[in-house]
Amino acid sequence: GVCAVLGNLAIGHKLHCIFIDTGLLRKNESEQVMAYYHDNLGLNLRRIDAREEFLTALAGVSDPAEKERIVTERLMSILSREAAAIDDIRLVIQGTNVTDTLYRPHTGSTIDGLPIIEPVRELFKDEIRQVGQELGMPAVLVNRQPFPGSGLASRIMADVTAERLDILREADDIFRHDV
């Protein structure tokens, strides 16, 4: 989110944001992303509905590391495909932070030859939150709990199914808001 706002400040209407809805997000998170970044900020944001694609790719997989690998691979593939469809694209801005560099495999410095710019790569999450606050982003977005790339899939200790995701999404929502 902070990188989208920074990118918008830097290049304005030339920024094309791609939001990949994996179906592995918390309850209402997809709608919140679209409402804030597209509707409120007016960013050129396109939502890619890849929920079925991710469910299919994760079918029968229970190992957390394998889930993370599959999700990362699918995200990069979809991003590559969607970026190729944008005229005159010159670079990709990605929200990699220090924790990502320590715990996730490096995905490379280019996507299909396009350089990847990582403006918050050397910052920890609390520092990124400070940047978001300085940019005037709402607390509900800036203070969100960090969430792994594999999303809810990493919290399911079995293979990922739509039913398990729905149950976990509801349980997570109750825990975050009512407990």
Whereabouts are the PLM-identified features?
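Glycine-rich SAM-binding Motif I of class I
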Residues: 1
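Conserved strand-to-helix beginnings and helix N-cap segments that scaffold or border functional pockets
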Residues: 4, 27-31, 129
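Active-site adenylate/phosphate-handling loop in enzymes that bind or generate adenylated species
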Residues: 5-15, 19, 40-41, 55-135, ...
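Cofactor-binding loop segments of dinucleotide-utilizing enzymes, especially the Rossmann-like FAD-
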Residues: 20-22, 50
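Glycine-/small-residue-rich active-site loops that bind phosphorylated ligands and cofactors
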Residues: 24-25, 123, 160-163
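Glycine-rich phosphate-binding loop and adjoining beta1-alpha1-beta2 segment
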Residues: 25-47
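Conserved beta-strand termini and adjacent loop/short-helix elements that scaffold enzyme active sites
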Residues: 48-50, 119
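Basic, glycine-rich polyanion-binding accessory segments appended to enzymes
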Residues: 159-179
